[in-house]
């Protein structure tokens, strides 16, 4: 009889230890005695229902919210108790179940904490790769665009004359200047840095002179052609020139250009 009572007592203690992990910890203490209360055990029927569900879903032992609510109704436990039981069961009961099936518990997610750590490491790796990728904003393309923006370079064009050297027919001169720029060669320009010289290289005056504008009969009537160095396309001096300067050479060039334009219009009408 004594041996039977000892066996019953031992089995009872084992069952209590086994069921003790099924209940959450009770850390509340009484103010008078200061001793910790003995934690209570969940009902065996409720624990068996939870064990059966854990065994059926041992490869993915994470019940959804609907399943937790259903288990709470079946076991007559609160949802918090069901959640705590599964948290402990995944660490204590699930590895033994997987080993009995011949599976490695390390290949299955026992706790969500490991999954969060792996996700965080993958996100950090992706962010590290992104930081090393160069962007177009960090390395802009420098190109030369003809426009008023001074940071992109300066096109090769003559400087405007000073106010004292304005001619009587500025529209014709602007037209011939644009034509000469179209006929002249283009050169690449680069952004000018701080401290560099801002002088634009001069282009030979022959590039801006159209020899087809002058004919033998025109030279006989008008006399010798003016000196190309007279200052039409050259850079003006820093100080304004004398107001009494002779501009007969410029006027002669304008007259020749107007005459040539009239001849071209007449030829166009005849051919049409």
Curated annotation (Swiss-Prot):
Superkingdom of origin organism: Eukaryota
Low complexity bias (residue ranges): 22-33
SMART domains, A to Z: HOX
Polar residues bias locations: 222-233
Biological source species: Mus musculus (Mouse)
Single biological process term from Gene Ontology: fibroblast proliferation
Compartments, record wording: Nucleus
InterPro entries registered for this protein in UniProt: HD, Homeodomain-like_sf, KN_HD, TALE_homeobox
Subunit structure: Interacts with SMAD2. Interacts with CTBP, SMAD3 and HDAC1.
Annotated motif CTBP-binding motif, positions: 24-28
SUPFAM superfamilies, A to Z: Homeodomain-like
Lineage of origin: Eukaryota, Metazoa, Chordata, Craniata, Vertebrata
Gene Ontology CC: nucleoplasm; nucleus
Listed GO MF terms: chromatin binding; co-SMAD binding; DNA-binding transcription repressor activity, RNA polymerase II-specific; JUN kinase binding; RNA polymerase II cis-regulatory region sequence-specific DNA binding
Family: Belongs to the TALE/TGIF homeobox family.
First-listed, main subcellular location of the protein, grouped into a coarse class: nucleus
DNA-binding region per Swiss-Prot/TrEMBL record: 35-97
Key word Transcription present: yes
Gene: Tgif1
Protein name as catalogued: Homeobox protein TGIF1
